[in-house]
Structure formats: C-alpha cells, structure tokens
Design a protein with these regions (language model features):
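Conserved ABC ATPase "signature" region
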Residues: 33, 37, 44-59
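Helical segment within the ABC ATPase nucleotide-binding domain
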Residues: 103-116
Length: 147
C-alpha cells in the first residue's frame, strides 16, 4: 500500500526497463506529464528540460506510436530522470540506440553523475559500452557476483 512517505521514497529513485511502456496514442510530452502527476512531482520546466536533455523536444508533441525503438528508449530515460532522482536504475539503457544515440546517453549519464551526484545502477549485456563510463563493474553469472 502506497502512503505519502512511499511517494517521497519513489521520487528519489528513477528507473527504466528494457522496453519502456507508454500510452501510444498520447504524445511524449503528455506521457511525461502524466508520470509527473502520479508521482506528485511537477514543475513546468521539468518535462521540457527532460525532453531537451534527450534530444526529443521536436518529437515531444508526436504520438508515441510514431516513435522508433531508440526514441522510446530515450523517452523512458527522460521519464526516469524527471524527478531528479538520487538513484537511477537502468535495464539495458542502450537498447535500440544507434552509435550516436549510445554516445549521447553515455555523455548524459556521466553528466548526471558528475553534476547531480546521481548514483546509477545499470544492467546490460553490452559490457564494452558500459566499460566506457562505469567506475565500478560487477558481473553476475547464475545469480553469483563473479567480479
């Protein structure tokens, strides 16, 4: 059961699953505004800022069903950072992104850590990409931490 204190904790955590889910007939901006509404967090600038950070400003007014997989992935990340969380949990954040998109996300994640002090936990099969920016890497095999 969610209480007022539950929302305070949830605002401190952002997350994205491998294939983020949205209301496809709503546009990107509306999806982010809805997320803000049910999280009890809304600032007129937070949605625009998140769209801009993920290079989705122009696409923000287009229905999500017109988005590519990479655009949906970036919209999912925009949703995850809306509340300026302390902890960001990402499952396959590079999924569906082209090399330029991967670099953009890598640079954004570095910036979020350096400028906002955000802790980021990433689950990924693309170890070579994660090694480009992670400061600590753990490898799990059959439920055991190997490294």
């Amino acid at each position: 059961r969610l209480t007022h204190s539950s929302y305070n904790v949830l605002k401190r955590i952002g997350s994205i699953i491998e294939y983020p889910v949205f209301f496809d007939h709503s546009n990107g901006k509306e999806n982010l505004e809805l997320h803000c509404e049910y999280m009890g967090y809304y600032s007129p600038h937070c949605v625009e800022n998140a769209l801009e950070m993920l290079d989705l400003s122009k696409a923000g007014n287009k229905p999500v069903h017109n988005y590519s997989l990479g655009m949906k992935q970036r919209l999912g990340l925009a949703r995850a950072i809306l509340t300026k969380p302390e902890l960001l949990i990402l499952d396959e954040p590079m999924n569906g992104l082209d090399p330029a998109g991967m670099k953009q996300i890598r640079d954004l994640l570095k910036m979020l850590c350096q400028e906002n002090g955000m802790t980021i936990l990433i689950s990924s099969h693309i170890l070579s990409e994660i090694e480009n920016f992670a400061d600590t890497i753990g490898i799990i095999n059959q439920g055991k931490l190997l490294r």
